[in-house]
């Protein structure tokens, strides 16, 4: 993909391979099961992964809404977003993720769901994002009204904001049947030490974090811990908000991409993320129907094994 005659570059790549080999060995020792190269989901449908706390299955690719669905009252943009959601469900998608922080994304999702007759496969993932815990219940009720749902499948504490106060309320709501799962989120590598402590001490069902071909810190501790603790993992920023794809698309798609049924860099990037055995679902955001169909293609076909994942990471890091 990228040739460089500099001998120091070659040494750097060797050390990277050695590091990846050690990381792989540590992962195996931790009990993580990597997919076999060429493994195909039953009947050629979308590949799913189990939520450890319940056994429920979710497709490997979901739909985020940060920026892409923040369209205000632009009716044409709302209808365009509805078509994205329609295509998402048609391709086998389930999990849609949003937050009060995301501007008008919540009412945009609600508009789409209403137009589509509230599709039964929907797995609704929302967040509570407010510093005053006393206002949390009102915010969650407003979010449900925007979506047009009676309860959310998953409620997450957004970016750890006031998590000590919000989590007990969410656990109470879950026990009362007012939501199905409880989670917590972070992004861009923030507050990982605190997140790790929460994962070790709180009975959460989900954790959401950033992970992609370049930002891989979570492989060291958080992803192995999630699998050990039975915590489902949602991955945000799988494309680094588009900057990763901008870099990758300057280069020809490598020959090995066909071996994992990828015909685009977006699918390569997503399959790297979702092939990690601790990852439950990645949530790329898009405002284009063609892109949501392409993204959902990463939930079908073969996944990279550990050896190919190492090669993918090394080659992309060298670009």
Region roles according to the model:
Residues 26-30, 34, 51, 206, ...:
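Structured C-terminal cap/extension of enzyme domains
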Residues 13-18, 28-48:
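N-terminal twin-arginine translocation
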Residues 66-78, 125-133, 259:
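Active-site mouth loops of central-metabolism enzymes
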Residues 54-71:
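N-terminal small/glycine-rich loop or linker at the start of catalytic domains
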Residues 97-112:
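Glycine-rich, proline-tolerant flexible connector loops at the mouths of alpha/beta enzymes
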Residues 51, 63, 96, 109, ...:
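Conserved, mostly hydrophobic/aromatic
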Residues 131-217, 221, 228-234:
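Glycine/proline-rich, positively charged
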Residues 1-14:
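N-terminal secretory signal peptides
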């Amino acid at each position: 993909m990228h040739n460089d005659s500099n001998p120091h570059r070659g040494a750097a790549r060797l050390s990277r391979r050695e590091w990846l080999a050690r990381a792989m060995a540590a992962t195996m020792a931790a009990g993580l099961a990597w997919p076999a190269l060429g493994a195909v989901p039953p009947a050629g449908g979308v590949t799913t992964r189990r939520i450890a706390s319940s056994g429920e299955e979710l497709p490997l690719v979901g739909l985020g809404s940060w920026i892409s669905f923040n369209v205000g009252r632009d009716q044409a943009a709302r209808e365009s977003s509805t078509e994205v959601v329609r295509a998402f469900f048609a391709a086998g998608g389930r999990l849609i993720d949003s937050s009060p922080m995301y501007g008008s994304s919540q009412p945009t999702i609600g508009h789409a769901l209403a137009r589509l007759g509230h599709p039964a496969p929907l797995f609704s993932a929302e967040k509570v994002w407010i510093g005053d815990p006393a206002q949390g219940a009102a915010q969650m009720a407003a979010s449900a009204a925007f979506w047009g749902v009676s309860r959310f499948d998953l409620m997450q504490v957004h970016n750890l904001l006031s998590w000590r106060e919000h989590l007990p309320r969410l656990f109470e709501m879950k026990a009362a049947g007012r939501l199905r799962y409880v989670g917590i989120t972070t992004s861009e590598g923030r507050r990982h030490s605190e997140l790790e402590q929460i994962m070790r001490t709180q009975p959460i069902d989900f954790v959401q974090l950033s992970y992609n071909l370049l930002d891989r810190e979570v492989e060291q501790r958080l992803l192995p811990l999630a699998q050990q603790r039975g915590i489902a993992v949602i991955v945000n920023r799988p494309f680094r908000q588009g900057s990763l794809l901008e870099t990758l698309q300057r280069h020809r798609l490598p020959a090995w991409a066909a071996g994992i049924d990828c015909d685009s860099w977006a699918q390569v990037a997503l399959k790297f993320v979702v092939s990690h055995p601790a990852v439950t679902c990645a949530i790329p955001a898009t405002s284009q129907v063609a892109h949501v169909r392409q993204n959902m293609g990463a939930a079908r076909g073969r996944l990279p094994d550990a050896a190919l994942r190492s090669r993918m990471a090394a080659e992309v890091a060298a670009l």
